Design a protein with these regions (language model features):
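Segments of small-molecule ligand-sensing domains
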Residues: 297-307, 318-372
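Periplasmic-binding protein-like
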Residues: 97-110, 130-132, 173-176, 224-234, ...
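Extracytoplasmic "Venus flytrap"
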Residues: 38-59, 81-88, 110-111, 175-184, ...
Length: 378
């Protein structure tokens, strides 16, 4: 009896093993027909509007790619995760995507802090990475597998300072969030260039936890600067603008691309402010209007710059991957991305410099009657 039971167990285990091998083979076969792209962004938390918009823009482009037959016969499969805007959450999600989901390419993160943390991990794993919207310069520095779609903090900081000079401004106060890589990077580049332009620059700082800016703004009001430059994200900027209005501050407010989204809840207090961007909803460019129509049809809301950059990231990957004969080669993929040089993007013509950062024109936006309006391209 013991012999029969043992034999039955053996036969049962052999059957299980056979099923396991077959299922693994089926999975491997299935995986060969897809390109797995990991996507991480804040879908909840303080910068959820950024994460949701970026990922939605990217998913819209992927939907279009798959509907048109995919990439060389392969469909794109998205593996998605919510970082909640937290660096450690983003790191954990990325590690899981590499070790368990076996992604081929990574798109993310959305903001600079998590992107800076993930970039060296992507480089080490040799996973081609594109951050659609992470602007900190060091994200790509020295990492040949890491690219971006947006311009960098130094790039836009320099251009905004030159733009301010072109408008004849002679005195500017900079408000810097010391707890934000984005704010510090943009602030430093702006201050350096503004001083080169002969502009008188003062600076005041606050922390990421601050909510009451009245004491700081009262001090700033005493400077009587023509411009107050605030390089930060829309939620914090909204509080600053609201309190500045209460204090009767009439300086011209300016900012970087983190302002996009200000129109949702703070359009009234932001009226007249000007900020750097790469996308204007009223831009008559055919690519812009076609994208806006498709996005509104898909999500029933107007897109912001983050959605446009997410969509453009999909276009960059589509173009690059179609030029790769062996899609299993990560080296071939990252080289194809490097060689991208396209004019058919929503955010304008783009080519990569030596550090895999895009060179493109800066679009200046003015908040008018609670909406974003194209001011000029500079």
């Amino acid at each position: 009896v013991r012999e029969k039971i043992t034999m039955k167990k053996i036969l049962f285990l052999v059957s299980l093993l056979a099923l396991f091998v077959l299922s693994c083979g089926a999975k491997a076969s299935k995986d060969k027909n897809v390109i797995k792209i990991g996507v991480i962004g804040a879908l909840t938390g303080n910068v959820a509007q950024y994460g949701t918009s970026t990922i939605n823009g990217f998913k819209l482009k992927v939907k279009e790619i798959n509907a048109a037959g995919g990439i060389n016969g392969k469909k794109i499969e998205i593996v998605e995760a919510d970082s909640k805007g937290d660096v450690q959450e983003a790191i954990n999600a990325f590690k899981k995507m590499v070790s368990q989901d076996k992604i081929d390419i990574f798109v993310g993160e959305v903001t600079s802090g998590p992107s800076l943390a993930i970039a060296p991990l992507a480089q080490q794993a040799k996973i081609p990475m594109i951050t659609a919207t992470g602007t900190a310069f060091d994200i790509t520095k020295g990492k040949d597998f890491v690219y971006r779609t947006t311009f960098t903090d130094p790039y836009q900081g320099v251009v905004v300072a030159k733009y301010a000079k072109s408008k004849g401004y002679k005195s500017i106060t900079v408000l810097t969030n010391t707890g934000s890589d984005y704010s510090v990077g943009l602030s430093n580049a702006f201050k350096e260039q503004a001083q080169k332009e002969g502009i008188q620059v003062k600076e005041e700082q606050y922390t990421a936890d601050d909510k009451d800016f009245r004491a700081l703004l009262t001090k700033v009001k005493g400077y009587n600067s023509e411009v107050i430059f605030v390089p930060d994200y829309y939620n914090t900027i909204g509080l600053i603008l609201t309190q500045a209005k209460e204090l009767g501050i009439n300086s011209q407010f300016m900012g970087g691309d983190g302002w996009d989204g200000i129109q949702t809840n703070f359009g009234k207090v932001a009226n007249g402010a000007v900020f750097a961007s790469q996308f204007a909803p009223d831009d008559p460019d055919q690519n812009v209007q076609k994208f806006i129509a498709a996005y509104k049809n898909e999500y029933k809301i107007d897109p912001i710059i983050f959605a446009a950059l997410g969509y453009d990231t999909g276009t960059i990957l589509e173009t690059a991957l179609k030029n790769v004969s062996d899609l299993s080669s990560k080296d071939a993929i990252k080289e194809a991305i490097k060689n991208f040089n396209g004019a058919n993007l929503v955010t304008g013509s783009l080519k990569y410099d030596a550090e895999r950062n895009p060179e493109k024109k800066v679009t200046f936006i003015e908040v008018k009657d609670g909406k974003l309006a194209l001011k000029e391209k500079f």
